Curated annotation (Swiss-Prot):
Xref: PANTHER family: DNA REPAIR PROTEIN RECO (PTHR33991:SF1)
HAMAP family assigned: RecO (MF_00201)
Family: Belongs to the RecO family.
Gene: recO
Domain of life: Bacteria
The protein's name: DNA repair protein RecO
Role noted for this protein: Involved in DNA repair and RecF pathway recombination.
InterPro entries noted in UniProt: ARFGAP/RecO (IPR037278), DNA_rep/recomb_RecO_N (IPR022572), NA-bd_OB-fold (IPR012340), RecO (IPR003717), RecO_C (IPR042242)
Pfam families cross-referenced by the UniProt entry: RecO_C, RecO_N
Disulfide cross-links: none
A single BP term in Gene Ontology: double-strand break repair
UniProt KW DNA damage keyword: yes
UniProt entry keywords in alphabetical sequence: DNA damage, DNA recombination, DNA repair
Species of the source: Synechococcus elongatus (strain ATCC 33912 / PCC 7942 / FACHB-805) (Anacystis nidulans R2)
Keyword Transport among record annotations: no
Length: 266
C-alpha cells in the first residue's frame, strides 16, 4: 500500500500546532474532509507557509501518518487572496466555509460540495461591500439544497396550500418557520413552542426568497432595501442553524456589517 497520496484540496481551517507546524482542515473532491499537519508551515521561509493559508486551493502530496497525515508538498492552483481585502468578502467566505465544514464528511468523496464552494468563493471574490449579499444568499440556498435542507417557499409547509406574495398590500406578512421547513399559510395552525423561531416576511421579501433558487442570475443588490437582505439572510441562517443544531459563529461579523453604516476594507 502506498504511503503517500495526491489530491486537490482547499484549506477550510488552519490553526497553529506546536512551535512551527500548522493543523489544516482540507476539503477534497475525492477524499472529502481531511485533517493534516503542515510541518514547519509557520517558519518564516517555509515553502508551505503561503500555500496553506485559508481558502488556498492546491494540488497536494500527503503522507499517511499513524494519527494525522502530513502535507509534504502543495502546488497552488488558486489563492483567493482578494477575499481578505474586504470585510464583507471575508465574512461571506467564512460564512460559507462554516456551512461546508458542518456538512462535509471525513474521507468521503464529495465532488459537488467542493465544486460549489470553489465556484462561490470565486464569485464573492469579485464583489465589494454589500454586493456580496445576493451571491451569499444564493450560495447559502444551494448549500442547503445540497444537504436536503432548503426551505419550502411556494407552498405552506403544513397544509401544502400555495402561498403567493401580495405585493399590492404593504402590510401583508407571511410566517416563516425554520423548524417546520418554510412558510406558513394564514390558515396553518400549530402549537408553537416557546423557543421555536418564527419570522415574519413582507411580500417583497417572500417574492425575492422564491426567486433565489429559480433565477439563473443573482438578484441585483439595488432590487431590495438593506433591511430586506438582512431578513432573507436571517431566514436562511436560521434554517441552517436548526438543522446543524448550533449557531453559525461567522454570522456575527456579517450581521454587524449589515447593521452598520458602511463596510470597510482591511
Amino acid at each position: 500500500m502506498s504511503r503517500t497520496y495526491t489530491t486537490t484540496a482547499i484549506v477550510l481551517k488552519a490553526t497553529p500546532l506546536g512551535e512551527a507546524d500548522r493543523l489544516l482542515t482540507l476539503l477534497s473532491p475525492d477524499q472529502g474532509l481531511l485533517r493534516v499537519v503542515a510541518t514547519g508551515a509557520r517558519k518564516p521561509r517555509s515553502k508551505l507557509g503561503g500555500r496553506t493559508a485559508l481558502f488556498v486551493v492546491g494540488d497536494c502530496l500527503i503522507a499517511c501518518g499513524k494519527s494525522l497525515d502530513r502535507l509534504q508538498q502543495v502546488e497552488t492552483l488558486t489563492s483567493h487572496t482578494a477575499l481578505s481585502g474586504d470585510l464583507a468578502r471575508l465574512a461571506a467566505a467564512q460564512y460559507l466555509t462554516e456551512l461546508v465544514l458542518a456538512q462535509a464528511l471525513e474521507r468521503h468523496p464529495q465532488p459537488e460540495l467542493f465544486a460549489l464552494l470553489c465556484r462561490d468563493l470565486a464569485r464573492i471574490e469579485t464583489q465589494s461591500g454589500l454586493e456580496v449579499l445576493p451571491y451569499l444568499l444564493q450560495s447559502t440556498w444551494q448549500l442547503l439544497a445540497w444537504a436536503g435542507w432548503a426551505p419550502q417557499t411556494h407552498y405552506c409547509c403544513l397544509t401544502q396550500q400555495a402561498v403567493q406574495p401580495r405585493l399590492e398590500q404593504s402590510r401583508w406578512r407571511v410566517r416563516y418557520s425554520p423548524s417546520l421547513g418554510g412558510v406558513l399559510a394564514d390558515t396553518a395552525a400549530y402549537q408553537r413552542r416557546p423557543n421555536q423561531r418564527e419570522l415574519l416576511l413582507t411580500a417583497t421579501e417572500l417574492a425575492a426568497l422564491q426567486q433565489i433558487p429559480t433565477s439563473q442570475t443573482v438578484l441585483p443588490l439595488a432590487s431590495l432595501p438593506r433591511e430586506a437582505w438582512q431578513m432573507l439572510e436571517r431566514a436562511l441562517r436560521h434554517s441552517a442553524e436548526y438543522h446543524l443544531e448550533r449557531p453559525l459563529q461567522s454570522a456575527l461579523l456579517l450581521e454587524t456589517l449589515l447593521t452598520g453604516s458602511h463596510v470597510a476594507s482591511v
